[in-house]
Amino acid sequence: MDWSRKKVLVTGGASFISSHLIDHLVAKGARAIRVVDDLSSGRLTNVQGHVESGVVEFHQADLLAPGVPQRMVEGVDVVFHLAAIHGGRGFVDLHQAACAQNLALDGILIKAAYEARVEKFVFASSGCVYPNHLQTDVRQELYLTEEMVGPPYDADNLYGWAKLMAEMTLRAYARDFGFRSASCRFFTVYGERGVENHAVIAMIARAFVRQNPFEVWGDGTQIRNWTYVGDIVRGMVLAAERIDDGTAINLGTEERTRVIDAVREVLRYTGQEAEIRFLPHMPTGPL
């Protein structure tokens, strides 16, 4: 795909992952990128350089507001849809009604993109679509593979259900209308510009302020797939270039890391000796 000839829309474009995606698209030759973000969690400074260079056309707007999705997709060739109501584990567990709004957001934008004859739609999905009942035994060496998502569906809270429904909607549009799309499932993403309420940045921040006892949600045995943001955005662009039929793919690694091991590495690297205090009553998600 010749990105220099494509008009691209990135929703939620001032956020952590999206801003890295824009950097990567620019490096691949993109010269016309429209960004929409309500700045509820994104930061304009993440894309300010591209705005000033004229590559990014920035719109501060709410995609749930009437008419906004239709205006944003007008004249666009490729949509990367990363906008969502989201947060760390505590947020998605404690704000289910807020996360449920993603069902409407995704459906409205997909319909608008199809009606505007967008060439390709790439959706930021999540490991939360995987069945909870498969992930309850930490002693089991489980690798989540794409075909595990199927009946009986058992997504992780309303955030996961919304992501799953968007994936299924895109497959339906591909099957019924020939609408070209792909879904990319993120796991635990880390990297520069990461926000403070996500796991890795929160750990590092607590280490630098010398928190002692050092608090860990759960018992530390939860398994996570830590994935660098640069790998995520390269995967999204490859999906845009190579997948047309709404297929959902994992963007992650096969490296399994316990939360407690990540904590110990952060403490070691920052030179902190601290007592570790487990908080088993706090939200942890699937183990």
PLM region spans:
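N-terminal Rossmann-like NAD(P)+-binding domain of SDR-like oxidoreductases, especially those catalyzing
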Residues: 1-189
